[in-house]
Design a protein with these regions (language model features):
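N-terminal helix-cap/turn-to-beta initiation motif at the start of protein domains
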Residues: 52-60, 99, 839-856, 880-883
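Beta-sheet ligand-binding and adhesion/scaffold domains
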Residues: 849-876, 889, 905-989
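Beta-strand-rich structural segments
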Residues: 262-265, 643, 657-661, 700, ...
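N-terminal secretory signal peptides and thylakoid transit peptides that target proteins
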Residues: 1-15
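Accessory beta-strand-rich segments of carbohydrate-active enzymes
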Residues: 50, 119-123, 138-245, 270, ...
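Extended carbohydrate-recognition surfaces in non-catalytic/accessory domains of CAZymes
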Residues: 26-166, 219, 225-228, 240, ...
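Extended substrate-binding grooves/exosites of carbohydrate-active enzymes
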Residues: 56, 62, 78, 83-96, ...
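Beta-strand-rich binding/interaction modules
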Residues: 259-297, 656-673, 697-701, 810
């Protein structure tokens, strides 16, 4: 469909016309036009503005209001889709909630990111299995649609700029409306999208952004959340600017230097051709300039793009690797008419990454075995709406066990996950959601590639997951088209797919690296037949286990944590890694999964509401298998022994005791008596069978003949106290940062009580707030948004987010009968990143009628939409009484008579006892104060004369037209009353 740029490009809108055009929505009630700041500005004049024309990318996460809509009933969906509401009938006429004066006091206040699904109660409905038993979908229309509303200002200084609103992701069908103007829709729950709202933004005034999100449909078979669960941005640029994701740095590393091939795409959204050049500067990790280049000037037609290609050589580059995360920055300046009109920054890394069929992945020429995990994007207490700090927390937990790579199963990740991986040294196998060559599928994949191509952590593109068509000739056509997109917009990374039941056949031949899911024996056969093709385990293991549980109990939904427990006969952790690590040609693989996740409960369904595949539970508490991987994926000494040693009623019965370790030998002691030492074989564990007796089990680990580590489990006493630990010593007071507060239940001697389920309540004071709770129990149906949670296997967690004011955050954990615990961290005042200010209506305070007032519908009489329009039901009366004088404004009271939200001043306002009178716009208001309300009569000076009933005319037939041929429709025209009763009530916003 044609866009504004297409019109400009076609020359249908001349520059002179643009310069002269003005947006003038006429207000019949106030008989006034919008201020001149709303005029479109000739962007030839803008270039001379210099610094005022700079790019701004402002976070639009704070200060939203939210309300559920309805997928089936327009009356519960603010009239959307109803026959009487013409949302699409007239431009700029989209539903009352778009009015600034609209009363949203019953809407919930919140900040983004937001996932409303995790706030819902669980439902035991088999159809909800993959949604984690949250009520979403066609059967649950009342909880499947949400409306978001945000009021914000755009400065008058932004006149002439290009204004866009960017969404990093919303689940799933999103409709965007600005100032009553329908902007557009987006389908898909994971890829970013944006809208150019330049023509619809009110410059120098307040704006109302309305977003409807419909989560009825599903993309996946796992929990996906609902709502605007990623960041939203307001972006302001010159009409001549770097295109979104319009820079790409491709590096070629040679001895002592790196040659950077730089692509810059510049867009001209103005109405006239522009001559522009690009200045590129490369900054090293310390911020020093190490290379510069200026392109020749090139003419860019109106509505067109221009690509600039430059070469910069960096001497003695610092290469990005897993151990040394050196990040460079490309600073791009667009220059026109002697002024810099746009400045765009691109972080990137210099490194090489290639696959060798015999050595696997080579990073900077060094073989790196992929010790990877697949991960979905939800977390305890949060659902799918993860603050940035939680991305870093999750990457850190994976790195603790030696994981060096993540597969973003099964969708494009949030950009902040890639930032975390760039900065912390983690590789990314970047996956799209839809394997398709239809326009939507290719667009999603192109967005993924363009957005993520400068991240050094991204080493390969994934074109899909377990697609049955991939192994067919038709799949080959689809994958070929997708591969062409990757080559066009990147070309520096290979492509692959996580296939189902096949390796490298049919359409899978399109893959540069042969991926396979679970088929270890077939992978070996494939390598023998195709020794020149790199091979990688795109999905492996699928072992299951419940943290802290060692006896499988189907009724309770728990699975033993001993490693052999898998689903569908797939490999154990130890079985897969021993196979993988013994084959240098096998590039490594990605374990299913790093973290437990909601939905797809495995191996059991209700009461389970989450999977148990994770090596780590939903909170981030490690399971026992974590220490197997840590033993063989890291160089640090590891010794971990399990199970716990609290087994009342099991005296004299045999219990398997396992130890995970990478030491030379481990000796086991039971109640002080040695059961012998065992040698540790590579990539394996050691085990003993022990007859249970209360007391202790102790493992002693030896390396090079020396005792270097011990690990001990003891039979504990009853739960006596709580211990509270924060994962960080301090946070930034930016309203975004998050700290995990882990609660451990201990006995009187300070030992973790592993079989307790005490209810723990969190209280937060100071410069923070509680945003979620969790415990890793896959069967727990308590709300993640409550203030308390039961301990599970001795642990639970509270997630605390900072406020925007510096100070201390104090968290207290209490439980009946146990000693409480508290912890304090500092929230350091910081400079906030650029963001859109939160708009709040001023509430005047004072005597008499001073305050905010809104109309209410009459309790008797024709209380319908027509009357609502007449009285201006969404109006706001800001009244200020000083003695007998009444001043203030009336906003949005034009009602049926047209107009917008520009406040009209109150003039000639008086208060005499209980009587009030004032004028505003074209209306006179008179009435009396009655307890908690003001009863007024509104007299309107109409710009037209109301029709009068037809007169009796001699000779006019009872049926048929008048003899003079006059129009009889005047007989049924609405007669607008000249005086309307208006009742006001006092409000807080």
């Amino acid at each position: 469909m044609p866009t504004r740029r297409d019109v400009l490009k076609a020359g249908l809108l001349a520059p002179a016309a643009v310069a002269a055009a003005k947006q003038i929505p006429f207000d019949l009630a106030n008989n006034a036009a919008r201020p001149e700041s709303d005029a479109l500005v000739d962007d030839n004049a803008l270039a001379s503005a210099g610094p005022g024309a700079g790019r701004e990318r402002l976070l639009l996460d704070f200060g939203w209001r939210f309300h559920f809509g309805h997928a089936d009933d327009p009356n519960k969906d603010f009239g959307f889709g109803g026959p009487a509401v013409g949302n699409f009938q007239k431009t700029g006429n989209f539903m009352p909630a778009c009015s600034i004066a609209y009363d949203d006091s019953e809407w919930k206040s919140l900040d983004l990111p937001h996932d409303w699904a995790v706030e819902l109660p669980f439902q035991n409905d088999p159809d909800l299995l993959n949604k984690g038993f949250y009520p979403l979908g066609r059967k649950y229309p009342g909880t499947s649609v949400g409306w978001y509303r945000r009021v914000f200002d755009i400065s008058a200084e932004d006149a002439g700029k290009r204004i866009t609103i960017e969404f990093d992701g919303a689940y799933r069908e999103t409709m965007v409306v600005l100032n009553g103007f329908y902007i557009g829709r987006h389908s898909g729950g994971y890829d970013p999208f944006s809208f150019d709202v330049t023509d619809f933004a009110y410059i120098g005034q307040r704006n109302v952004l309305l977003v409807r999100v419909d989560a009825t449909e599903s993309d996946g078979w796992f929990y996906e959340g609902a709502g605007i669960y990623r960041h939203v941005w307001l972006v302001k640029t010159n009409r001549l600017h770097v295109k979104k994701w319009g820079t790409f740095v491709k590096s070629q590393v040679r001895t002592g230097e790196a040659s950077l091939s730089i692509l810059t795409e510049v867009s001209n959204d103005g109405a006239a051709s522009r001559n522009a050049r690009v200045n590129s500067t490369v900054l090293d990790p310390s911020g020093q300039a190490v290379g510069k280049d200026t392109s020749p000037a090139a003419s860019i037609s109106a509505g067109d793009d221009q690509s600039y290609r430059q070469e910069i050589v960096v001497k003695r580059p610092s290469l990005w690797s897993l151990e040394e995360r050196h990040l460079y920055k490309l600073v791009t300046e667009v220059q026109a008419d002697g002024q810099v009109v746009d400045r765009y920054e691109t972080p990137f890394g210099i490194r090489t990454a290639e696959f060798d069929a015999e050595k696997g992945l080579l990073l900077n020429g060094k073989a790196v075995k992929l010790k990877g995990t697949c991960n979905h994007q939800d977390h305890a207490g949060l659902g799918a709406a993860l603050p940035d700090a939680v991305q870093y927390y999750r990457v850190g937990k994976l790195q603790e066990m030696g994981c060096n790579s993540i597969r973003t199963s099964h969708n494009p990740p949030t950009p902040e996950l890639l930032d975390a991986c760039d900065q912390m040294g983690m590789l990314i196998f970047d996956e799209t959601r839809m394997m398709s060559s239809n326009p939507e599928g290719l667009s999603q994949f192109e967005n993924l590639v363009r957005r993520d191509r400068n991240h050094p952590s991204v080493f390969m593109w994934s074109m899909g997951n377990e697609e049955g068509q991939a192994n067919t000739a038709r799949g080959g056509l689809i994958l070929s088209a997708m591969k062409a997109v990757a080559k066009e917009h990147d070309g520096s990374r290979p492509v692959s797919i996580a296939p189902a039941g096949a390796i490298g056949t049919g359409g899978l031949e399109m893959c540069d690296v042969a991926g396979y899911n679970y088929m270890d024996p077939q992978a070996e056969e494939f390598h023998k037949k195709h020794p020149d093709k790199p091979v990688m385990g795109t999905e492996t293991v699928s072992a299951v286990g419940t943290r802290g549980i060692y006896v499988t109990d189907r009724a309770k939904g728990f699975v033993s944590s001993y490693d052999p427990y898998t689903t569908t006969g797939r490999a154990s952790a130890e079985g897969w890694w021993r196979f993988c690590n013994a084959r240098p040609w096998l590039s490594g693989g990605f374990v299913w999964t790093g973290f437990d996740y909601r939905g797809e409960p495995s191996p059991y369904t209700w009461p389970n509401i989450s999977s148990q595949y994770g090596i780590i539970d939903t909170c981030g508490f490690p399971k026992d298998s974590f220490y197997y991987y840590q033993s063989w994926w890291t160089e640090k000494p590891v010794l971990h022994i399990f199970p716990h040693w609290n087994w009342p009623g099991m005296e004299g019965k045999e219990i398997a005791v396992w130890a995970y370790s990478n030491l030379d030998r481990v000796e086991l002691f039971v109640n002080g008596k040695s059961l012998g030492a065992k040698d540790i074989k590579k990539d394996s564990h050691v085990a003993w069978v022990v007859k249970y007796a209360p007391g202790s089990i102790e493992a002693r680990g030896w390396k090079d003949g020396k005792l270097v580590m011990t690990a001990k489990r003891e039979t504990t006493g009853a739960a006596a106290k709580l211990v509270l630990r924060a994962n960080r010593e301090g946070v930034s007071a930016d309203g975004e940062d998050v700290t995990m507060f882990a609660v451990e239940v201990q006995d009187a001697q300070g030992r973790t009580v592993p079989i307790t389920d005490n209810e723990v309540t969190f209280r937060v004071s100071g410069a923070g707030k509680l945003i979620g709770v969790g415990n890793g129990d896959p069967t727990d149906h308590a709300s993640d948004k409550g203030t308390s949670r039961k301990a599970f296997s001795g642990f639970c967690m509270g997630l605390v987010q900072s406020l925007k004011t510096g100070g201390n955050i104090t968290v207290e954990a209490t439980s009946p009968g146990l000693a409480s615990a508290s912890a304090r961290i500092a929230a350091k005042a910081v400079k906030l990143r650029p963001q859109v200010a939160v708009w709040e209506r001023e509430v005047p305070s004072g005597a008499g009628v001073t305050g905010l007032w809104r109309p209410v519908l009459p309790t008797s009489g024709p209380a319908n939409d027509f009357i609502s329009m007449l009285i201006g039901i969404n109006a706001v009366f800001t009244l200020r009484q000083e003695g007998s004088k009444l001043t203030g404004t009336v906003e949005g009271a034009a009602g049926f008579f047209g107009g917008d939200d520009v406040p009209a001043p109150i003039v000639e306002g008086t208060v005499d006892g209980d009587r009030v009178a004032f004028k505003s716009g074209s209306s006179d208001f008179k009435g009396a104060v009655k307890e908690d309300r003001i009863e007024l009569q509104r007299s309107v000076n109409l710009p037209w004369e109301s029709p009068k009933p037809p007169k009796e005319e001699p000779g006019r037939p009872a049926i048929g037209p008048a003899p003079d041929g006059s129009d009889p429709s005047i007989d049924v025209t609405w007669e607008v009353p000249s005086s309307i009763p208006v009742v006001l009530r006092r409000v807080e916003r």
